[in-house]
Regions:
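Transmembrane alpha-helical insertion/packing segments
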Residues: 1-30, 126, 135, 207-209
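Membrane-water interface of transmembrane alpha-helices
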Residues: 43-60, 229-243
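Transmembrane helix-loop-helix hairpins at the membrane interface
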Residues: 120-274
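Alpha-helical transmembrane segments in multi-pass membrane proteins
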Residues: 10-56, 218-226
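Alpha-helical membrane-inserting segments
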Residues: 18-26, 44-52, 89-102, 183-187, ...
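Membrane-helix interface and helix-disruption motif detector
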Residues: 1-3, 24-34, 174, 209-220, ...
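Juxtamembrane helix-loop-helix connectors linking adjacent transmembrane helices
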Residues: 22-32, 61-134, 138-146, 273-277
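Interfacial transmembrane-helix boundary/kink motif in multi-pass membrane proteins
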Residues: 2-13, 35, 57-94, 245-267
Length: 277
């Protein structure tokens, strides 16, 4: 578990270094380096996960079953559907409360460039849903989950929140990370968090684009509230199934292991968060 934590932590340190490098370049080169900054740790993490798998097989003396983290059956889709609206509502509420608290100290989120809707959806919803979920959910699922589901959930959420390097995003990113990974672990697939991440970010983009008026905001929030109510009713009707599903997302493995690399990551992200104020 400790070596696995060290590896995942170092992958995120590598990401921070590469993102910092990409920030020095503008235009298409800066954009390209931004995506390369995610691709490099993802590729390294994938190959390292195969190394850890071989080591576990050597110790156990038996071959492990191939993972099905990219599988997404119709049954899993039906289970995920009622979880979408409540998840978006939880993340939205956490984001709103964080913004209100930080506004007391004069801290606000950086404005998002107002471009056409399709461009904003690709840049702020689709790309993050794929790149961030592969790095912060898929890689921990492959490397950490075989040792501890609780540790996998905690660390993936911690890294996901730290890497935003923003005090205004850290709390709700951690909450989103916990919820996303819990659902991924429970369903045994990375697709739920990719879908949830995209829908959550797309909802924020639509709200920013068309929710400037009180009427627009009211309509969007009203639709979300109605979907949450319907979803909660569906979950309550199948509370035994969902209860067993969520309990299966936890185990008695190690939930926290300290490594110097983690301290280095916290210090790097903290420094960048302060400089971004």
């Amino acid at each position: 578990m400790t070596n696995a934590i060290k590896l995942v932590t170092l992958l995120d340190v590598l990401l921070i270094c590469l993102l910092t490098l990409s920030a020095y370049f503008g235009g298409w080169l800066g954009e390209a380096l931004y995506y390369v900054a995610f691709l490099v740790p993802i590729i390294v993490g994938f190959y390292c996960s195969e190394y850890f798998k071989r080591k576990r097989e050597e110790v156990a003396g038996v071959a492990e079953e191939p993972d099905e983290l990219f599988s997404f059956s119709f049954g899993k889709a039906k289970t995920l559907l009622p979880l979408i609206a409540p998840t978006v509502a939880i993340v939205f509420t956490a984001s709103l409360l964080t913004s209100l608290f930080l506004s007391l100290f004069g801290i606000s989120s950086a404005p998002v460039e107002n471009r056409n809707l399709l461009t904003m959806l690709v840049a702020h919803a689709l790309a993050p849903a794929i790149m961030e979920e592969l790095l912060f959910r898929y890689i921990p699922l492959k490397i950490l989950m075989p040792y501890s589901k609780r540790g996998c959930i905690f660390y993936s959420a911690l890294y996901f929140s730290l890497i935003h390097c923003s005090f205004s995003q850290l709390p709700y990113a951690f909450i989103a990370g916990v919820v996303f990974m819990m659902i991924d672990v429970a369903l045994g697939s990375v697709w739920p968090s990719i879908i949830l991440h995209f829908i959550n970010n797309a909802s924020s983009v639509v709200l920013m684009k068309y929710g400037s008026s009180a009427v627009g905001t009211g309509i969007l929030l009203g639709v979300l509230a109605a979907l949450v109510i319907v979803s909660v009713v569906c979950i309550v009707l199948k509370k035994k199934e969902y209860g067993e599903l969520m309990r299966g997302a936890f185990d008695k493995g190690e939930a926290f292991v300290y490594t110097p690399a983690l301290l280095a990551l916290v210090m790097m992200c903290g420094y960048l968060a302060v400089t971004n104020l």
